[in-house]
Protein backbone atom coordinates (compact mmCIF):
# COMPACT_ATOMS: atom_id res chain seq x y z
CA UNK A 1 0.00 0.00 0.00
CA UNK A 2 0.88 3.69 -0.10
CA UNK A 3 1.87 3.62 3.56
CA UNK A 4 4.52 1.00 2.79
CA UNK A 5 6.00 3.23 0.09
CA UNK A 6 6.35 6.07 2.61
CA UNK A 7 7.95 3.80 5.20
CA UNK A 8 10.51 2.34 2.79
CA UNK A 9 12.17 5.74 2.32
CA UNK A 10 14.88 6.63 4.85
CA UNK A 11 13.26 9.95 5.71
CA UNK A 12 9.79 9.16 4.43
CA UNK A 13 8.20 11.27 1.68
CA UNK A 14 8.33 15.05 2.06
CA UNK A 15 5.63 17.46 0.93
CA UNK A 16 5.58 21.25 0.57
CA UNK A 17 2.12 22.47 1.65
CA UNK A 18 0.95 26.03 1.00
CA UNK A 19 -0.42 26.85 4.45
CA UNK A 20 0.62 26.95 8.08
CA UNK A 21 -0.64 23.50 9.01
CA UNK A 22 -2.88 22.31 10.54
CA UNK A 23 -4.80 25.25 9.04
CA UNK A 24 -6.11 24.74 5.50
CA UNK A 25 -5.45 21.08 4.94
CA UNK A 26 -6.69 20.24 1.46
CA UNK A 27 -6.37 21.12 -2.19
CA UNK A 28 -6.89 24.91 -2.25
CA UNK A 29 -5.28 26.55 0.80
CA UNK A 30 -4.21 29.61 -1.17
CA UNK A 31 -7.63 30.67 -2.45
CA UNK A 32 -9.33 30.06 0.89
CA UNK A 33 -6.74 32.13 2.78
CA UNK A 34 -7.47 35.10 0.49
CA UNK A 35 -11.23 34.47 0.57
CA UNK A 36 -11.25 34.45 4.38
CA UNK A 37 -9.31 37.70 4.63
CA UNK A 38 -6.27 36.19 6.36
CA UNK A 39 -3.38 38.57 6.98
CA UNK A 40 -0.75 35.82 7.14
CA UNK A 41 -0.29 32.59 5.20
CA UNK A 42 2.81 30.47 4.85
CA UNK A 43 4.39 27.18 3.91
CA UNK A 44 4.84 23.96 5.87
CA UNK A 45 7.40 21.30 4.99
CA UNK A 46 5.86 18.05 6.20
CA UNK A 47 6.25 14.30 6.16
CA UNK A 48 3.54 12.57 4.15
CA UNK A 49 1.35 9.89 5.65
CA UNK A 50 -1.82 8.15 4.51
CA UNK A 51 -4.06 11.07 5.53
CA UNK A 52 -4.63 14.29 3.61
CA UNK A 53 -2.00 16.78 4.80
CA UNK A 54 -2.00 15.20 8.27
CA UNK A 55 1.67 14.12 8.48
CA UNK A 56 4.27 15.39 10.94
CA UNK A 57 5.39 18.99 10.41
CA UNK A 58 9.11 19.66 9.92
CA UNK A 59 9.53 23.39 9.30
CA UNK A 60 7.34 26.42 8.61
CA UNK A 61 7.70 29.94 7.29
CA UNK A 62 5.13 32.74 7.49
CA UNK A 63 4.28 34.88 4.47
CA UNK A 64 2.21 38.08 4.96
CA UNK A 65 -0.64 38.86 2.57
CA UNK A 66 -0.82 42.25 0.88
CA UNK A 67 -4.11 44.15 1.02
CA UNK A 68 -4.55 43.53 -2.72
CA UNK A 69 -3.32 39.91 -2.68
CA UNK A 70 -4.83 37.63 -5.30
CA UNK A 71 -4.84 33.86 -5.53
CA UNK A 72 -2.25 34.14 -8.28
CA UNK A 73 0.11 36.53 -6.49
CA UNK A 74 -0.03 34.51 -3.26
CA UNK A 75 0.70 31.33 -5.22
CA UNK A 76 3.88 32.94 -6.56
CA UNK A 77 4.97 34.15 -3.11
CA UNK A 78 4.38 30.76 -1.47
CA UNK A 79 6.09 28.87 -4.31
CA UNK A 80 9.24 30.95 -3.82
CA UNK A 81 9.08 30.68 -0.02
CA UNK A 82 8.43 26.94 -0.19
CA UNK A 83 11.34 26.26 -2.54
CA UNK A 84 13.73 28.20 -0.27
CA UNK A 85 12.45 26.47 2.87
CA UNK A 86 12.71 23.01 1.31
CA UNK A 87 16.34 23.60 0.31
CA UNK A 88 17.08 24.75 3.88
CA UNK A 89 15.17 21.89 5.53
CA UNK A 90 16.54 18.82 3.71
CA UNK A 91 20.17 19.12 4.90
CA UNK A 92 18.95 19.75 8.47
CA UNK A 93 16.74 16.68 8.26
CA UNK A 94 19.70 14.58 7.14
CA UNK A 95 21.81 15.86 10.05
CA UNK A 96 19.03 15.18 12.57
CA UNK A 97 18.57 18.89 13.30
CA UNK A 98 14.82 18.86 12.62
CA UNK A 99 12.34 17.47 15.12
CA UNK A 100 9.09 16.30 13.49
CA UNK A 101 6.04 17.78 15.21
CA UNK A 102 2.73 15.94 15.24
CA UNK A 103 -0.30 17.87 14.02
CA UNK A 104 -3.31 18.39 16.26
CA UNK A 105 -6.21 16.15 15.30
CA UNK A 106 -8.44 19.15 14.60
CA UNK A 107 -7.49 21.95 12.23
CA UNK A 108 -7.89 25.60 13.24
CA UNK A 109 -9.73 26.33 9.99
CA UNK A 110 -12.12 24.55 7.70
CA UNK A 111 -10.83 22.00 5.21
CA UNK A 112 -9.57 23.82 2.11
CA UNK A 113 -11.63 21.95 -0.44
CA UNK A 114 -10.86 22.10 -4.14
CA UNK A 115 -12.07 25.24 -5.92
CA UNK A 116 -14.72 24.73 -8.58
CA UNK A 117 -15.75 27.13 -11.33
CA UNK A 118 -19.02 27.77 -9.50
CA UNK A 119 -17.09 29.21 -6.53
CA UNK A 120 -16.45 32.26 -8.70
CA UNK A 121 -20.16 33.12 -8.99
CA UNK A 122 -20.91 36.30 -7.07
CA UNK A 123 -23.78 36.42 -4.60
CA UNK A 124 -24.58 40.12 -4.38
CA UNK A 125 -26.45 39.69 -1.08
CA UNK A 126 -23.07 39.12 0.60
CA UNK A 127 -21.15 42.12 1.93
CA UNK A 128 -18.90 44.26 -0.26
CA UNK A 129 -15.90 43.10 1.79
CA UNK A 130 -16.70 39.42 1.21
CA UNK A 131 -17.22 39.92 -2.53
CA UNK A 132 -14.00 41.93 -2.91
CA UNK A 133 -12.08 39.08 -1.25
CA UNK A 134 -13.79 36.56 -3.51
CA UNK A 135 -12.74 38.54 -6.60
CA UNK A 136 -9.10 38.51 -5.47
CA UNK A 137 -9.15 34.85 -4.38
CA UNK A 138 -10.61 33.66 -7.68
CA UNK A 139 -7.99 35.48 -9.78
CA UNK A 140 -6.69 34.17 -12.14
CA UNK A 141 -8.87 31.02 -11.97
CA UNK A 142 -11.76 30.44 -12.09
CA UNK A 143 -12.31 34.22 -11.89
CA UNK A 144 -15.22 35.90 -10.14
CA UNK A 145 -18.20 36.32 -12.42
CA UNK A 146 -21.75 37.58 -12.65
CA UNK A 147 -24.17 38.46 -15.45
CA UNK A 148 -25.14 41.77 -16.99
CA UNK A 149 -28.09 41.95 -19.37
CA UNK A 150 -27.92 38.16 -19.72
CA UNK A 151 -24.22 38.07 -20.65
CA UNK A 152 -21.40 36.62 -18.56
CA UNK A 153 -19.21 39.25 -16.93
CA UNK A 154 -15.89 38.45 -15.26
CA UNK A 155 -14.78 40.86 -12.58
CA UNK A 156 -11.03 41.24 -12.15
CA UNK A 157 -10.60 44.18 -9.83
CA UNK A 158 -12.85 46.00 -7.41
CA UNK A 159 -12.69 48.03 -4.23
CA UNK A 160 -14.97 48.64 -1.28
CA UNK A 161 -15.89 52.31 -0.95
CA UNK A 162 -18.55 52.15 1.74
CA UNK A 163 -19.60 49.76 4.47
CA UNK A 164 -22.69 50.40 6.50
CA UNK A 165 -22.36 47.85 9.29
CA UNK A 166 -25.92 46.84 8.65
CA UNK A 167 -28.74 47.11 6.22
CA UNK A 168 -28.57 50.71 5.05
CA UNK A 169 -30.99 50.11 2.21
CA UNK A 170 -33.59 48.57 4.53
CA UNK A 171 -33.78 51.99 6.23
CA UNK A 172 -34.70 53.68 2.95
CA UNK A 173 -38.44 53.52 2.14
CA UNK A 174 -39.11 50.95 -0.56
CA UNK A 175 -35.61 49.45 -0.31
CA UNK A 176 -34.14 46.40 1.34
CA UNK A 177 -30.69 44.84 0.96
CA UNK A 178 -31.86 41.66 -0.74
CA UNK A 179 -33.95 43.47 -3.35
CA UNK A 180 -31.34 46.14 -4.08
CA UNK A 181 -28.29 43.82 -3.97
CA UNK A 182 -26.58 43.69 -7.34
CA UNK A 183 -28.10 46.94 -8.59
CA UNK A 184 -25.79 49.40 -10.32
CA UNK A 185 -25.93 52.68 -8.44
CA UNK A 186 -23.41 54.68 -10.52
CA UNK A 187 -21.79 53.89 -13.88
CA UNK A 188 -19.13 56.43 -14.87
CA UNK A 189 -15.39 56.92 -15.32
CA UNK A 190 -14.79 55.88 -11.68
CA UNK A 191 -16.28 52.45 -12.33
CA UNK A 192 -19.48 50.53 -11.70
CA UNK A 193 -20.76 51.25 -8.19
CA UNK A 194 -22.81 48.22 -7.16
CA UNK A 195 -25.01 47.79 -4.11
CA UNK A 196 -24.32 44.65 -2.09
CA UNK A 197 -25.93 43.10 0.98
CA UNK A 198 -23.79 45.51 2.99
CA UNK A 199 -21.87 48.29 1.35
CA UNK A 200 -20.94 49.55 -2.09
CA UNK A 201 -18.45 47.77 -4.33
CA UNK A 202 -16.79 49.64 -7.21
CA UNK A 203 -15.86 47.41 -10.15
CA UNK A 204 -12.71 48.85 -11.73
CA UNK A 205 -11.68 46.11 -14.18
CA UNK A 206 -13.89 43.60 -15.97
CA UNK A 207 -14.34 41.39 -19.01
CA UNK A 208 -17.57 40.85 -20.90
CA UNK A 209 -17.94 37.47 -22.61
CA UNK A 210 -16.23 37.52 -26.01
CA UNK A 211 -14.31 40.69 -25.14
CA UNK A 212 -10.87 41.40 -23.72
CA UNK A 213 -10.17 42.35 -20.12
CA UNK A 214 -10.28 46.12 -19.65
CA UNK A 215 -10.69 48.99 -17.23
CA UNK A 216 -14.34 49.69 -16.47
CA UNK A 217 -14.04 53.31 -17.62
CA UNK A 218 -12.84 52.14 -21.06
CA UNK A 219 -15.51 49.44 -21.21
CA UNK A 220 -18.32 51.92 -20.51
CA UNK A 221 -17.30 54.06 -23.49
CA UNK A 222 -18.47 51.28 -25.78
CA UNK A 223 -21.08 49.46 -23.71
CA UNK A 224 -23.83 51.25 -21.83
CA UNK A 225 -24.83 50.01 -18.39
CA UNK A 226 -27.58 52.17 -16.95
CA UNK A 227 -27.92 52.90 -13.23
CA UNK A 228 -30.58 50.55 -11.88
CA UNK A 229 -29.34 47.62 -13.98
CA UNK A 230 -29.18 44.52 -11.80
CA UNK A 231 -26.09 42.35 -12.06
CA UNK A 232 -26.55 38.62 -11.80
CA UNK A 233 -29.51 38.47 -14.19
PLM regions: where:
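Glycine-rich phosphate-binding loop
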Residues: 1
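An anion-binding loop in the catalytic cleft
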Residues: 125-233
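Alpha-helix N-cap/helix-start motif
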Residues: 23-27, 124, 212
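Short, flexible active-site loop motifs that bind/organize anionic cofactors or intermediates
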Residues: 64, 121, 209
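Donor/substrate-binding cores of folate-linked one-carbon enzymes
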Residues: 4-118
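Active-site loop ensemble at the mouth of alpha/beta enzyme cores that anchors a bound cofactor
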Residues: 112-114, 119-130
Amino acid sequence: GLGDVYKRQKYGCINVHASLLPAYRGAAPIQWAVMNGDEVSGVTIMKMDEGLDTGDMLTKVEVPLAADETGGSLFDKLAAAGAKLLVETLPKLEKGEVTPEKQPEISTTEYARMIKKEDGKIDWTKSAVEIERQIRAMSPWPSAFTKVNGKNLKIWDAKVIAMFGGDLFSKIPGQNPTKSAGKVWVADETGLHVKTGDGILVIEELQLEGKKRMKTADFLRGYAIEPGTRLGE
